[in-house]
């Protein structure tokens, strides 16, 4: 008689949260039908089966190969008391410092998007004061020493009445790069605005919302046909030459067929240095879905977006779009050279070992001197014929055919996929590695983007988090960090 | 199909039906085994939604790997009725009958409606076919527009030494293989673009080592003697050593190629 078999391969166990009540629940990770699933059950709200990835090989690559020693904040801001994710942050059990720190300077926005994790809109009038913003910036510096990237966000940060003063405050601190996350409306419409922004060069980058070329898609995501805004904002940014990343929020079945076109468009804009794709995070305002947001129907995972990029931009090979080691299962990236003849991928030419083992943990690798030098060396001429793989030969062939311009750092183009973690796919193993963090308006805490939108934003902390904390009746005695583990080992001998 | 290619196809198919072939090469007949099949499937963008054609599927091992690990639906076709029967039985045993089907067909004359598949694969078989260009055209026309093809096979950059042109060399697909550039040109000529060639010579070193070990084991246990072989394989040791040297010198190797139907 043959033994009974599970309908899946068991891979691992983890801790998740119930997507209804956000209580911690036991979970399994299993492989079935070519996909990675999370199985979990809440005593009150029942069982859930959540798609984590539709590419087992890539998922395993991210989890098992792209691992690096995590970097920590200078000092944690909270203690480990209720358990993850109720102790943010940064708590001593978090396994990554903040690569990108967001400061939301206003709740106000000149759009009211049906999809908005922050729930911003014209009806919300609260702007943070400069004093408060200074406290938040000082928190960033206290945690990171020299923060790699500060992203000014909102709401729509450019509507803050003291927007440029805020940029000055950032500049007065030891911050590597200043990013402004904007829908581009003020840049497009206001004479002189782009020029004033340009005064903050170098080290300033615009994160420009850019979801689609189709009016019906823009109406669904942004309640506004922003095509002219996009065109005019990019004209202005090209004129003043401010480095720009196009940021596309991707909703399943709506604009997931435009990824290749957005990349192509980005490569044709002189100021554009990369494209970031973010599937909609199930958090905040999620309007305009037929009979409401339905995670089984509407959720979109990183591996699906990755494959769609590879299908729609065939110039990229699978080995060109790889996990980012600091948070490998939720960040993927590709580097390419932007030439007049098109994109020439670079990532596949670099030994993954090199990417894993060098540079600080940051999602913008090319800003790290060692990696930057390595990329530049790739297109220097000292490679011997013997050391060339076929990929390298192809690469050099393409360079031969497009020699007129001087190649340099300016030619590097980045494609990034950022899948923020929602309650459905919450995986404790992964949430501890998140590196995009939001500075809490209290200026005391730094909270992962993902958990901030689920438990800490605005009223959530009081309405949702507090009751959950009360349920955790036995306070933990401390973190499960290495330092404590070592101490208990010593004390037992 | 010409009489010669008919003979060749059936000759090769017969050869692959022999138990000795499976004993020597293992479940996956091609170099790299299931590991390379997974690599080829990833490189060809196979997903749970993909409808995949595996041309010259042999015992269906790759079809099962792709159905089980990638969740794809796979149609395998082969010239050998015996291999197909084994493939079906193994799929049934693995509970994959809903995800796999097997069809008797020649690679040079596929019985599928044009544009039926998202991905077409041909592992370690292309250079066995009399007319590679015809086979590539078949692999292309089976695809939907924008579909991908994935090939693994030997390449031969300099002519093979005489010792490798014997039967064993033929079984190992070495003798008639094109060069790496030859594959590129053939794919381009058949109407593919975004052609990518990846060298995977490690698969050959592994396979040669495995065959050598198995020969020793079979001889030592007297599981099989020369008299059991319907075809004279001869002493494999010198051929394998020649093959290793030839690969090390860069004369031949193994590759996977992927391309898009343009």
What are these regions (language model features)?
Chain B
Residues 133-148:
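A short glycine-rich, Lys/Arg-flanked "PGG" loop and its adjoining helix->strand segment in the class I
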Residues 53, 59-109:
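Class I SAM-dependent methyltransferase SAM/SAH-binding core
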Residues 196-262:
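Conserved Class I S-adenosyl-L-methionine
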Residues 20, 154-174:
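Short, glycine-/aromatic-enriched active-site segment of Class I SAM-dependent methyltransferases
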Residues 176-190:
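Short alpha-helix
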Residues 30-48:
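Conserved alpha-helix/loop element of class I SAM-dependent methyltransferases that forms part
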Residues 108-119:
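A short acidic, Gly/Pro-enriched loop at the edge of an enzyme's catalytic core
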Residues 119-131:
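A short SAM/SAH-binding and catalytic strip from SAM-dependent methyltransferases
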């Amino acid at each position: 008689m043959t033994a009974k078999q599970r309908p899946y391969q068991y891979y691992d166990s983890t801790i998740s949260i119930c997507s209804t009540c956000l209580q911690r629940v036991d979970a399994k990770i299993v492989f079935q039908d070519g996909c990675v699933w999370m199985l979990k059950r809440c005593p009150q709200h029942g069982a859930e089966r959540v798609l984590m990835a539709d590419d087992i090989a890539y998922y395993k690559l991210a989890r098992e190969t792209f691992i690096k020693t995590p970097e920590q904040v200078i000092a944690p801001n909270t203690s480990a008391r209720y358990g993850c994710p109720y102790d943010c942050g940064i708590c001593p059990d978090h396994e990554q410092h903040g690569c990108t720190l967001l400061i939301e300077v206003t709740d106000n926005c000149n759009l009211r998007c049906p999809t908005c994790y922050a729930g911003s809109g014209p009806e919300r009038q609260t702007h943070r004061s400069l004093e408060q913003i200074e406290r938040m910036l000082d928190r960033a510096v206290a945690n990171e020493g020299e923060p790699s990237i500060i992203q000014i966000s909102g709401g729509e940060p450019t509507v803050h009445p003291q927007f440029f003063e805020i940029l000055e405050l950032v500049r007065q601190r030891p911050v590597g790069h200043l990013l402004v996350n904007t829908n581009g409306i003020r840049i497009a419409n206001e004479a002189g605005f782009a020029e004033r922004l340009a005064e903050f060069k170098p080290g300033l980058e615009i994160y420009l919302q850019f979801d689609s070329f189709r009016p019906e898609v823009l109406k669904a995501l942004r309640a506004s046909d922003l095509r002219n805004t996009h065109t005019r904002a990019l004209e202005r940014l090209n004129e003043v030459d401010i480095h720009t990343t196009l940021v596309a929020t991707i909703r399943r079945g709506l604009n997931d067929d435009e990824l290749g076109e957005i990349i192509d468009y980005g490569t044709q804009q002189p100021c554009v240095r990369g494209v970031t794709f973010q599937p909609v995070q199930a958090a905040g305002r999620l309007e305009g879905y037929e009979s409401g947001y339905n995670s089984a129907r509407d959720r979109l995972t990183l591996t699906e977006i990755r494959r769609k990029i590879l299908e729609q931009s065939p110039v990229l090979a699978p080995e060109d779009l790889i996990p980012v080691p600091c948070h490998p299962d939720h960040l993927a990236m590709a580097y390419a050279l932007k030439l007049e003849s098109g994109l020439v991928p670079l990532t596949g030419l670099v030994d993954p070992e090199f990417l894993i083992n060098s540079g600080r943990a940051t999602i913008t690798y090319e800003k790290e001197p060692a990696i930057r030098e390595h990329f530049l060396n790739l297109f220097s001429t000292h490679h011997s014929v013997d050391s060339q793989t076929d990929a390298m030969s192809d690469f050099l062939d393409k360079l031969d055919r497009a020699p007129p311009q001087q190649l340099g750092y300016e030619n590097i183009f980045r494609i990034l996929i950022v899948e923020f973690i929602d309650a459905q796919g919450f995986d404790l193993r992964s949430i501890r590695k998140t590196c995009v963090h939001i500075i809490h308006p209290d200026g005391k805490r730094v909270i992962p983007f993902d958990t901030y939108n689920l438990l800490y934003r605005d009223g959530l902390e009081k309405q949702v988090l507090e009751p959950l904390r009360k349920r955790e009746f036995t306070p933990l005695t401390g973190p499960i960090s290495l330092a404590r583990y070592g101490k208990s080992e010593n004390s037992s001998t | 199909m010409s009489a010669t290619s008919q003979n060749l196809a059936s000759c090769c198919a017969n050869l692959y039906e022999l138990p000795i072939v499976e004993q020597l090469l293992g479940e996956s007949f091609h170099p790299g085994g299931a590991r390379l099949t997974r690599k080829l499937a990833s490189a060809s963008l196979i997903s749970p939604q993909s409808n995949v054609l595996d041309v010259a599927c042999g015992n269906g091992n790759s079809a099962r790997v792709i159905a089980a690990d990638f969740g794809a639906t796979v149609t395998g076709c082969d010239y050998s009725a015996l291999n197909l029967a084994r493939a079906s039985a193994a799929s049934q045993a693995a509970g994959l009958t809903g995800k796999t089907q097997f069809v008797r067909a020649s690679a040079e004359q596929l019985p599928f409606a044009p544009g039926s598949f998202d991905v077409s694969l041909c592992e370690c078989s292309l250079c066995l076919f009399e007319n590679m260009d015809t086979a590539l055209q078949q692999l292309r026309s089976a695809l939907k527009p924008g579909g991908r093809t994935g090939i693994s096979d030997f390449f031969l950059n300099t002519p093979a030494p005489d010792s490798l042109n014997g039967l064993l060399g033929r079984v190992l697909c070495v003798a008639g293989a094109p060069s790496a550039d030859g594959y590129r040109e053939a794919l381009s000529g058949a109407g593919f673009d975004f052609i990518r060639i990846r060298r995977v010579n490690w698969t050959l070193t592994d396979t040669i080592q495995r065959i050598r070990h198995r020969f020793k084991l079979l001889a030592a246990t007297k599981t099989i003697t020369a008299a059991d072989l319907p075809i004279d394989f001869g002493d494999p040791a010198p051929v394998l050593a020649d093959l290793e040297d030839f690969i090390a010198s860069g004369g031949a190797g193994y590759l996977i190629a992927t391309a898009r139907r343009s």
